[in-house]
Amino acid sequence: MTTPRLLTDDQMRRFVAHGYLCLRTELPDSFHRGIFERFDALIGAEANLNPGNNLLPAVPELNRVFADPVVRGALTSVVGPDYVMHPHRALHNNPPGSDAQRIHKDSYWGYLRRVRNHRCRWAMIMYVPQATPLERGPTGVIPGSHYQSQRPDETLMPEVASCLETGGFLLIHYDIWHRKMKNHTQDKRFMMKFEFIRMREPDGPSWDHADPDWRFGELPGLDLSAVWRRQWDWLRGAGRQDAPVNDIDAAGLVDIDPRRRLAAINDVARNAAAARAHLPALAALL
């Protein structure tokens, strides 16, 4: 088995902030054409044989996807080297002219209690055996929304289309808001999703790590820099790293403008000692 292709620091920072990455397997196009044909035989226009959780026994060739070094490296990077595959999986069809879904978070299959977590304990792979340009109805995601328990305001956190190449896959934090977009073409579009679980707390970086500093480029809608920094440190196996802050904008904590309010909250979150004086204002926000 080939060595996993681990994510870089920049890719991990983007995953922490945005909650997803668009990647591609190293498997040849001929393999993906074969998978497309197998999916078509199961759930194409003339068939209704969706195997549900029995997808791997029905299409055992899919094991090659999960042995792919890019897939293994991506999963190792975000959920640790001893991750496990959950028994729930699904094969989805987006036929020509089908309508878009409503934006949603997936439920945790088999769990009666809420297990959502900002930390990356669950991840999902969404693999497509054919290219998914915008007109073919790719998966739409709201970058950064894995930190939001309620559907985000579209004016603050807009949706983007995760257009993939043939054999591409979407690596997502399990709690990200997403949906199937409308297929405007006469082409069939299939997607399979598998879930993966972290088995232990990180005790060090599990990706190709060189730079311990948190930095980011493109903002995914809202600036949650204090949250991102904490997740980054947790994934590195590091303790809490308080950062010096200037005077905290106390009035901003209760301002009607969500961006000013969030900036003030970020300042408080960066330094626990400075936050103590503002606990009443923070409690009032709950």
Locations of the language-model features?
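Conserved metal-binding segment of the jelly-roll/cupin
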Residues: 163-178
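Short sequence/structural elements of tandem HEAT/ARM alpha-solenoid repeats
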Residues: 276-282
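Non-heme Fe(II)/2-oxoglutarate
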Residues: 179-251, 257-270, 275
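Short edge-strand/loop segments of extracellular domains
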Residues: 93-95, 144-148, 195-201
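Non-heme Fe(II)-dependent double-stranded beta-helix
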Residues: 1-115
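Short inter-helical turns and helix N-cap capping residues of alpha-solenoid HEAT/ARM repeat scaffolds
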Residues: 256-257, 286
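Catalytic core of non-heme Fe(II) oxygenases with the double-stranded beta-helix
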Residues: 99-163, 205
